[in-house]
């Protein structure tokens, strides 16, 4: 089979280090009857060992040449190939208890993580290879330089753990950044959740639009509607110092106060 040339427009960097593959599979710990979807299988570095351990795998691949290659390599009863951009795929269609894995294209990693939140009710867990700095932001605590809108939005929905780093030399071609692997498990139904997901998203986005400024100034006309003392948010606080629970409380309070521009559930 002829060699596949990595395509820059798809952000392709193929994992070639077998020890890293083994570490990822060990972290996933797949069981024979698990329902697993792999995003961006590429040259099957993870696909092969997964199929050694599970009965069936669904793979989402945007590159038509790689999709055709996968169909030639594996029988349809073992591997279902969905030839599509993962950003357009409704992952909820794959059923309950879903385990999502993959070496995500770094050029669309954040949009893809937000897209997958729409299927979180169906997901058991997610194991992804990503740019290390993205994972550092995902798991960052309030007050740290990495704490961001991404941190707040994902931590409101998932319990996340950074597992290990992966050097550029583990890939072909090697990326210009260090990668890492993260485990994401959706929080239970009884988690603290906002009254309106849309309002929560709007408030967090506005708060981090000028992260170095005091939150009171960034919120503008919403500031007068905010019960600062009740929320435990200091008058001089910046967005990067406010915890996830406080952001949920802030969004709920602004929604209840009729803050302009916030969508009701």
Swiss-Prot record:
It holds the Pfam family RrnaAD. InterPro entries: KsgA/Erm (IPR001737), rRNA_Ade_diMease-like_C (IPR023165), rRNA_Ade_Mease_Trfase_CS (IPR020596), rRNA_Ade_methylase_Trfase_N (IPR020598), rRNA_adenine_dimethylase (IPR011530), SAM-dependent_MTases_sf (IPR029063). Belongs to the class I-like SAM-binding methyltransferase superfamily. rRNA adenine N(6)-methyltransferase family. RsmA subfamily. Keywords: Cytoplasm, Methyltransferase, RNA-binding, rRNA processing, S-adenosyl-L-methionine, Transferase. It comes from the Bacteria. GO terms for cellular component: cytosol. It catalyses: adenosine(1518)/adenosine(1519) in 16S rRNA + 4 S-adenosyl-L-methionine = N(6)-dimethyladenosine(1518)/N(6)-dimethyladenosine(1519) in 16S rRNA + 4 S-adenosyl-L-homocysteine + 4 H(+). Specifically dimethylates two adjacent adenosines (A1518 and A1519) in the loop of a conserved hairpin near the 3'-end of 16S rRNA in the 30S particle. May play a critical role in biogenesis of 30S subunits. Signal peptide: none annotated. This is Ribosomal RNA small subunit methyltransferase A. GO terms for molecular function: 16S rRNA (adenine(1518)-N(6)/adenine(1519)-N(6))-dimethyltransferase activity; RNA binding. SMART domains: rADc. Its EC number is 2.1.1.182. Its main location: cytoplasm. PROSITE patterns: RRNA_A_DIMETH, SAM_RNA_A_N6_MT. S-adenosyl-L-methionine binds at residues 13, 15, 40, 61, 85, 103. It is found in: Cytoplasm. Gene3D superfamilies: Ribosomal RNA adenine dimethylase-like, domain 2, Vaccinia Virus protein VP39. The gene is rsmA. CDD domains: AdoMet_MTases.
